A protein has these predicted regions:
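Short linear sequence motif anchored by a di-proline
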Residues: 1-225
């Protein structure tokens, strides 16, 4: 399960430039660096609209269609193996794919020790996702993150990992026919990410500051005061 992400780059315009994406001034004013993004938070996704990439804020949690009177909980992750054949996601996978814009994500080992998975060069980590338009009472679309089987790095502590879309294939992910996009639902190459142990401060969703990425030793030092 992918349930926490980061986006710590200072400037949203810099991010939009990296992605060659359109960004409205109104949306740009809402940006702030995030060190512990959790489900139900508003975050940033890349979609394809009006013949170009667009960077927009969206809420984390995709609400599946359900019979009248039977509300379903928002889904933060969907297994990538399901989207091509499952009736609940086939249409979304065909026409509403997105990339969730991050520079890393967290996973925990059995001792609840957190690790931050990120690129060695500090670059963007684009997670394959699906989105749905804003409901009548909401101002933002919603998204979910697709998962796949883990690569060797992540399999040491978890049996799933998010789908990571290579920057060079982002247009294929956003616009290609479903069969072509499905080929990108696969474990990331081993050299894509590194794992950095970080502070248990990130274990609490209320904590969202640079101290979340401090080394574990900072926890022990903090306990002395």
């Amino acid at each position: 399960m992918c349930a926490r992400v980061t986006l710590t780059i200072d400037d949203i315009d810099e991010i939009a430039g990296m992605l060659d994406a359109e960004l409205s001034p109104e949306d740009a004013r809402r940006y702030k660096r995030r060190y512990n993004v959790a489900p139900s938070d508003t975050h940033w996704m890349l979609e394809y609209g009006a013949d170009r990439r667009v960077l927009v804020p969206a809420k984390w949690g995709y609400v599946p269609t359900s019979p009248p009177g039977r509300a379903r909980k928002p889904l933060i992750n969907v297994r990538g193996e399901q989207v091509g054949s499952g009736h609940g996601f086939r249409e979304a996978f065909a026409s509403r794919r997105c990339a969730v814009v991050t520079d890393g994500f967290f996973e925990w080992n059995q001792r609840r020790e957190p690790f931050w998975y990120h690129r060695p060069d500090g670059g963007l980590v684009l997670l394959g996702g699906l989105f749905q338009g804003a409901a009548d009472a909401e101002r933002e679309p919603r998204f979910t993150v697709l998962t796949t089987r883990p690569n060797k790095l992540i399999s040491a502590i978890h049996d799933r990992m998010p789908v990571i879309v290579p920057a060079a294939r982002i247009d294929d992910w956003l616009t290609a026919p479903p069969a072509d996009a499905a080929a990108l639902i696969a474990p990331a190459p081993e050299d894509t990410l590194i794992a950095t142990p970080v502070s248990r401060r990130v274990n609490k969703v209320a904590n969202d500051d640079a101290a979340c990425l401090a080394p574990p030793e900072a926890d022990a030092q903090g306990s002395l005061f």
